[in-house]
Amino acid sequence: TRPDGAANALLEGRGVGLCDKSQIAIILPTTMNNFLKTADDYYNRTIAASFARLIRYVAAFMSFTLPGLYLAVTNFHTQILPTPLILAFYEARLGCPFPQLIEVLMMELSFELLREAGIRLPGAMGNTIGIVGGLIIGQAAVDANLVSPIVVILVAFTALCSFAIPSEEFAFSFRILKFAVIIMSAWLGYFGFLISLMVILLHLAKLKSCGYPYMMPFVGSELTGGEDEKDSIIRFPLRRLWRRPVFARVKECRKLKGNNDDYIYENKLIVLL
């Protein structure tokens, strides 16, 4: 995390661990909400920060659900789509020898391979391989009638959504879950899609970080008292964020003090554990 992000975590009552000769700081406890926030959110105004966070949440959800939802709808539940859209999907697939599941898996694995190759290659060459390679492979696959143009657009948009997640490690977990959702949706349709979402949601609700629910502040409202929701998907104005999160609320709940708009940080001793 960035230095200002680590400093903000200390002010919120979290612990920050530093390892010798490493530029990475470990913040505990952490929640899913922290992986979708950036330090820049606190430099921008409320509307801009809230809009950026909303985009990240939507992108994170679509990064692992969009291919599975496409397979469930086009293979099992075509009646929920308008007729012109269904005809466009089937016209795009004319001449493709593989089932839609194989098409999606082929393109997803190709994009994952290009992404991994781009990370390992140095500097500008890695970015060039990721962008140009994706365009060339996608266009070549469409020209050879191996995949439909709809699948190429779908996979490219899914990859774009994963790039919108601030934490690369957090985005990697969504990339893994994406394949599980694809298999379940291709097997059971919309029911498999919902089952996979339910299993993921139950697993996240069961996780804890240092004794605190991983999905705070969306769960555990009895702990947060409704205050931590002000800094979740919607970031309230900074003058409203005067209370520290639940991690430090036992001894000192007030982060800001002052009259009217004259807010300053309290002078407190911060101990780095």
Model-derived regions: residue spans:
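Cytosolic regulatory modules rich in charged/polar residues
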Residues: 1-103, 209-237, 249-251, 255-265
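Transmembrane alpha-helix detector for multi-pass membrane proteins
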Residues: 59-78, 93-169, 173-174, 179-185, ...
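Hydrophobic alpha-helical transmembrane segments of membrane transport and translocation systems
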Residues: 151, 156-272
